């Protein structure tokens, strides 16, 4: 099992022999070892080596050991492990790609996910 850096407990799990169709919105950590078709909104997402997801992801952090087909937006980090694969665009401030991992898409790296409002200066 992948070790998360923030030591949160695993709260939701989709097992290896399970499949799910539909969107998932949950707090905490979601681990997928089965098959999911739908969009996911969670704090942390872990895709196990045999897990697969077809859909978009919005999370604080994403760890991919299996496959994701869709857009992935992470506020903190995306980690693609050695057998992991993402097909789709990603957006994150930190990206870790292990040897053997696959990223088929565009990666956008942002310094900060906070929006800063700019002040308009009047011409003197």
Set out the residue ranges of the language-model regions.
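Intrinsically disordered, low-complexity terminal regions
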Residues: 1-25, 29-31, 35-37, 46-52, ...
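Short, small/polar residue-rich loop motifs at catalytic or cofactor-binding pockets
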Residues: 40
């Amino acid at each position: 099992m992948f070790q998360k850096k923030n030591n949160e407990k695993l709260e939701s799990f989709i097992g290896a022999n399970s499949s799910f169709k539909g969107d998932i919105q949950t707090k905490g950590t979601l681990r997928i070892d089965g098959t999911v078709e739908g969009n996911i909104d969670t704090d942390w997402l872990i895709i196990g080596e045999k897990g697969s997801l077809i859909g978009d992801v919005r999370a604080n952090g994403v760890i991919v050991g299996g496959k994701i087909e869709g857009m992935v937006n992470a506020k903190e980090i995306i980690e693609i492990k050695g057998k992991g694969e993402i097909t789709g665009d990603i957006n994150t401030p930190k990206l870790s790609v292990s040897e053997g991992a696959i990223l088929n898409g565009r990666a956008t790296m942002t310094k900060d996910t906070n929006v800063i409002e700019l002040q308009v200066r009047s011409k003197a």
